[in-house]
Amino acid sequence: MTKNIVDLFLLDIIENHYNDIVYKSTASQFYKQFIHFCNLHEFNIMPIQTFGILVKQYKSIYYHRLRNRYFTVIIQH
């Protein structure tokens, strides 16, 4: 379930154009956004250490999708 929450969070970033969070935020700002996401969806909040490990795993999976969406948004503006 913990992995699924991080998966949903990163998919939410991709779908809702929150790319600045990934590329321009510090780790603690990114974690604050995750806490906000968990509170919105009533998920339990995991410790930042666990979050960091899972995000490293998932960011490699979604990196190209995030990057492509990010540059597409910049070009459109």
What is the predicted role of each segment?
Residues M1-N4:
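Phosphate-handling catalytic cores of nucleic-acid transaction enzymes
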Residues D7-H77:
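Positively charged interface segments
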